[in-house]
Amino acid sequence: MTRQYSLDLLEKIQEKQETINVQGAEVLVKNIPDCDEKGAMDPRLYKDMKVQMNIMRFMPKNMMKMDASEKSVKNMRKQFNGIKSVPIVTKDINITNETVKTEDGYDIPIRIYNSISKRENAPILYFIHGGGFMAGSPDVVEELVKLIVEKTDILAVSVDYRLAPEHPYPIGHTDCYTTLKWIYENAEAFGGDKNNIFVAGDSAGGNLTQYCTTRDMEDGRNLVKGQLLLYPTINMCDYEDEFYSWSIDKYEIAPKYKKGLEKLLNVMHSMAGGMAEILGTQDIHSKYLSPYVDVNPDYPCTFITVGEHDFLMIECLAYAAKLTKKGVDTETVLYRGLGHAYGDNVGVYPQSEDLAIEMGNFILKHSRK
């Protein structure tokens, strides 16, 4: 299938990018390729979101909540499990299915992605999907993973960890960490470099990624060469400090989109409060669920990306600033005009392909160090 945009737009994104400073952190800003209006939504995203935003303007608050009820989980899974990307990868990518045995005897399904032109002793991207800890699957992010593999000739592994609320915290988290250890132990068998493992995840997967890195450091294994956090959930307890406090006034929104976007952002921010119930724990202040609270200066190199109109934008940029202040080698990319989960739109939004390029460049650059 062909891209739903011209490659000229991809080039425009790179031509129009600029660097700004946000609370001491250097941020690479990717402007909308075909719109210069400040605070505008990307026209492709607006086309997809217009009806939803209009509906939300008149929807009562009691209909906009996220909890562990069967109805809520079913609705969230229906929303998060849809595949929005279209295939644009032309290189043959071999996909191998394996399982990883947990301490309680469960077999975690994983997928290994291997291009026909794979590098010898290739760096490994270990990707953990998002979905609010209770939805999503490797299918949703598969085109992003395959695109990175195509552009870099590295190896990739994705994991289908157990989901809440059926499997409460920390089961999903430990599944992901168990898989990380398996990748290290078996890397050479599938042609990967165990000393160049990069863990990545989107949204809730970003939280799971940071968990893997933190546990890896605590256990003294040092398996993680770098981490890539795509619009991650890293401040579940909404902890405020010199870098972070959430306010709708911190969003730049053009008048045309203001009512709809402000309602959407406020709702999404308030819905995040239901995470404790979904995960089956009240321990959301811990460094594992809210890593923003306790930043370790010894974290490996970190890549962060977030959209200008993402409800997590404020905490993601605050996290980048906090990591930078602690001395962590941090690269941050902000996409103007986008919201949440644009990694799920490969072949549809040019920014999704640009993200794959940025992630690949980060991995290749740091794997040489």
Label each residue range with its predicted role.
Residues 2-41, 94-369:
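Alpha/beta-hydrolase superfamily serine-hydrolase fold, recognizing
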